[in-house]
Amino acid sequence: MFKNNKAFSGFSVNNLQKAKEFYGKTMGMEVTEGEMGILNLKIANGSNVIIYPKPNHTPATFTILNFPVKNIDEAVNELAKRGVRFIIYNQPNLKTDEKGVMRGNGPNIAWFKDPAGNILSVLEE
């Protein structure tokens, strides 16, 4: 029934203008304004992820978007130059280095937050 369906995902933020600036300028993605006060975030496969305002927004406690990259260090360095702060984890099963990159336990990955506090990641392919 849904085999060839163009499903899409969405998430909430508490400030659409900050989200538009972050995803458009900081992340360098195509962001357009949609109907009913939502943003459309264009992703590489031609799909959109919708970003919608929610007055009582609570940030996701899990990674909502993963951005595959060829070189994790280049991506982390570039995003850091653009003001992104990476999350440093120091837990028994989750440790990152001083740059915020977890290495050697699956793909190299670094987590960070958007202005609404939602968790995102860059991970090395």
Model region roles, listed by residue range:
Residues 1-2, 67, 76-125:
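Vicinal oxygen chelate
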Residues 47-50, 58-59:
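Short, charged/polar, Gly/Pro-enriched secondary-structure boundary elements
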Residues 8-10, 40, 50, 64-66, ...:
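Short aromatic/hydrophobic contact patches that present stacked aromatics
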Residues 57-70:
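Helix-adjacent hinge/juxtasegments
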Residues 4, 10-48:
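Core segments of cupin and vicinal oxygen chelate
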